[in-house]
A protein has these predicted regions:
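PLP-dependent class I/II
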Residues: 1-184
Length: 184
């Protein structure tokens, strides 16, 4: 979570521990997205039921992956402080570039992606817009509709946890977006 915001674990609120299942993943925090390792924190009676369900849905992660995960879980606060500092700098770099281009967007308060508002281009489909963006501008994006239950076709998601050079190149390409993608 970026300053000045502060994360509050729901289970720490009064009366919520016994009624909360916290699900999380190691994938993004430790840059191991392909491993698909996660965990839950819950009262013991819920953990017992979850273990039974888990046995029927999946097999355990390979031992080397589990050992690597334990290493990550033992990192001290400095790891997370450094990660937050790096992501804050990348967010600020990318947001400034988008502001300079004049594209409407969200300002993430804890994520490492930005949602761009593409409504000015008049596309009926965010998926089609993403195809055109990749083909004509050279920037990959994920359709925003992938993340909403409601029909939302005016948002796309761009990821900024990349090398600064990659972000500058993406911003350079996006600076020509209005020339390369005609309004409909």
């Amino acid at each position: 979570v970026y300053a000045p915001n502060r994360h509050v674990y729901f289970a720490t609120l009064p009366g919520m521990w016994e009624r909360t299942i916290s699900c999380s993943s190691l994938s993004k925090t430790y840059s191991i997205t392909g491993w698909r390792l996660g965990y839950i924190i819950a009262p013991s009676n819920i953990i017992e039921v979850a273990k039974k369900v888990h046995d029927f849905l999946t097999v355990g992660a390979a031992a080397p992956l589990q050992e690597a995960a334990v290493t990550g879980l033992r990192f001290g606060d400095e790891y997370y402080d450094d990660l937050r500092e790096k992501y804050t700098a990348k967010r600020d770099l990318f947001i400034k570039g988008l502001n300079d281009i004049g594209i409407k967007h969200t300002v993430p308060q804890g994520a490492y992606y930005v949602m761009l508002d593409i409504s000015e281009f008049g596309f009926e489909s965010d998926l089609e817009f993403c195809d055109v963006l990749a083909r004509d501008v050279g920037v990959g994006a994920v359709p925003g509709s992938s993340f909403f239950r409601e029909p939302v076709n005016s948002l796309i998601r761009l990821h900024f946890a990349k090398k600064d050079e990659t972000l500058y190149e993406a911003l350079n390409r996006l600076s020509d977006i209005r020339k390369k993608i005609a309004k409909r």
